[in-house]
Amino acid sequence: MSLAIRAATPADGGLVFALVRELAEYEKLSHEVDSSEHDLAKVLFAPQPRVFCDIAEWDGGPAGFALWFLNFSSFRGRHGVYLEDIFVRPALRGKGIGKALMTGLAQRCLAQGWTRMELAVLDWNAPAIEFYKSIGARVMDDWKICRLAGAALEKFGQKQPVHGA
């Protein structure tokens, strides 16, 4: 039994999209996926990408992925990582694959001088919450995620700017 973690390549576009769809199904959010394989490939494999993906392979086959991008802390004056997605196929859970994906990303943070890793987890996903706690992550109950998207974003974005303020 062997585990390998590697950066996604353009040849992985279909795989990354399939894993995103599997994650959405697990999270009961399939109805939210409106991206395409092309959309993901365009950002992941751009000449200067801003979004990155690591693929986990178990015995040479795809086992999971981590999709992430840089964020920034004005308090620390440095970048960090926002882990947008992490997913291990259900049949392969419990083998340390998710932990290996997280460890690789943590090592990259340390090597680059980035100060933290952040992620969001659904409140019903107790196994994931316990896993994050077990590796030292703090669940920040005093913060809430706010999202402006879709029609609300369009409506707000079309407001006229305030002049002379």
Language model segments and positions:
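A short beta-loop-alpha structural element at the N-terminal edge
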Residues: A4-V16, L29
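Conserved GNAT-fold acetyl-CoA-binding loop/helix
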Residues: F17-V43
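A short helix-loop-beta-strand connector motif used in the catalytic cores of GNAT acetyltransferases and
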Residues: K42-I55, Y82
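Conserved beta-strand in the GNAT
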Residues: I55, G61-L70
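Glycine-rich acyl-CoA binding loop
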Residues: A56, G94-K99
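A short, internal acetyl-CoA/4′-phosphopantetheine-binding micro-motif in the GNAT/acyltransferase core
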Residues: I86-R93
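Conserved acyl-CoA
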Residues: R89, A100-R116, R138
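C-terminal "cap" of GNAT-fold acetyltransferases
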Residues: T115-R116, V121-A165
